[in-house]
Amino acid sequence: MWLRPSIWLCFPLCLALPGQSQPKAADDLGGLYCGPSSFHFSINLLSQDTATPPALVVWDRRGRLHKLQNDSGCGTWVHKGPGSSMGVEASYRGCYVTEWDSHYLMPIGLEEADAGGHRTVTETKLFKCPVDFLALDVPTIGLCDAVPVWDRLPCAPPPITQGECKQLGCCYNSEEVPSCYYGNTVTSRCTQDGHFSIAVSRNVTSPPLLWDSVHLAFRNDSECKPVMETHTFVLFRFPFSSCGTAKRVTGNQAVYENELVAARDVRTWSHGSITRDSIFRLRVSCIYSVSSSALPVNIQVFTLPPPLPETHPGPLTLELQIAKDERYGSYYNASDYPVVKLLREPIYVEVSIRHRTDPSLGLHLHQCWATPGMSPLLQPQWPMLVNGCPYTGDNYQTKLIPVQKASNLLFPSHYQRFSVSTFSFVDSVAKQALKGPVYLHCTASVCKPAGAPICVTTCPAARRRRSSDIHFQNGTASISSKGPMILLQATRDSSERLHKYSRPPVDSHALWVAGLLGSLIIGALLVSYLVFRKWR
């Protein structure tokens, strides 16, 4: 029998254009700092395989590849850092930044030459910063000047402008190091990755605090202790999910709260007690909209154990995931998207039944296709699976991956896997690759028993072209993903070579006319020559 509850699945990716090598996530592309108006990050360019450092590349909004260099017109500034590293600042309004889902996105890559001298992208990383950046109150001049140079606690890594430093609620002096530092007050921030950041000066009270006694009120274990200290400052940084942080939801707002307190030196004798220290108790709150899609919070959902198998119809949850490699050992999380890929690089897709332990259930895929937007009905479309089988009209056919061989799965019949080579949509008139997002969609149903013929798809061996019309069968439902693909170009010189060596197409009719005219001219000359000889 068929269990009618099913799901229509899709998932986002980021693509790049053709290249031979597959990019890998670059661990040394890091050090990101999200400023109020620009990205700040550092990159280590030293290659482990060659003494020649690779080139730093970036993609524009149309997916074309460029060398990353100083270009004020495009809002990029590059400077040499310590050792082989480079520091980069990129304006959110520049040529290489795209806005999506309340975030600024900037794909960065490292380009190296192979043994034949062909340059290709070998590493990629996508930097993300939130669009909404709330400025904090700037400390007064007295609170800044009163901090000795040797006792200043850095507020942000260099390079940073005065405007960006003030947006963080910190002090700025370009002639000193650090140039951006905390003032003699309390500076608290709610970071985009879901952390409290609280800097406290001992001079925030009079008399000064016992600075080494400042601690979180509800937890004081190792992860909740200060991450940095000077003789004047302590800096706390901890996630919303730890250190006794309280959460409450009021209307459309989620509020995260914690408290800092400072101990006092109390002197006691038989007739009473005294103290000469200030009372300090600080409550810090971070407030976010529950309906926002750009919460800077890493959310973990802990579900109850699945119920025992039932034989009657009931609600089912299906999930589509993208694996990081062909082993399906790990998957991209929601925070990893958009995912950067090169064209023709395989994407490993998995659709599964969730939270069920009935081994007799089977998952059946119907259609899988791609669209350039979130709507599964959007045109143009490109099929990947048709009636559960690879679409034969594609020269890079989708590959079905048997799940039964996966020994680490308790219920293999709950899973379906396939791989597809990444691609970009092409304008049917201009014959150029379309920029913008690309989405994957699938329709699926759950059947029982899993081994029944109705649950098994048999694909024809012949390379007969199957109908690519996308239609929805009874007993299937739908759901759409919320992330895009980004189209990127893999080599800088491919478009230049195409333009250099391409020529306008030759009209065959024009060639025929030219040949006929040539024949007539030659014939006329020959007749004239014979007449001339006869006359003489």
Curated annotation (Swiss-Prot):
This is Zona pellucida sperm-binding protein 4. Component of the zona pellucida, an extracellular matrix surrounding oocytes which mediates sperm binding, induction of the acrosome reaction and prevents post-fertilization polyspermy. The zona pellucida is composed of 3 to 4 glycoproteins, ZP1, ZP2, ZP3, and ZP4. ZP4 may act as a sperm receptor. It is a single-pass type I membrane protein. The chain crosses the membrane at residues 512-532. The keyword Transmembrane helix applies. Its main location: membrane. Residues 463-536 form a propeptide. Residues 142-184 form the P-type domain. One of its GO terms (molecular function) is structural constituent of egg coat. Expressed in oocytes. Residues 22-511 are extracellular. Residues 189-462 form the ZP domain. One of its GO terms (biological process) is negative regulation of binding of sperm to zona pellucida. The gene is ZP4. It is found in: Cell membrane.
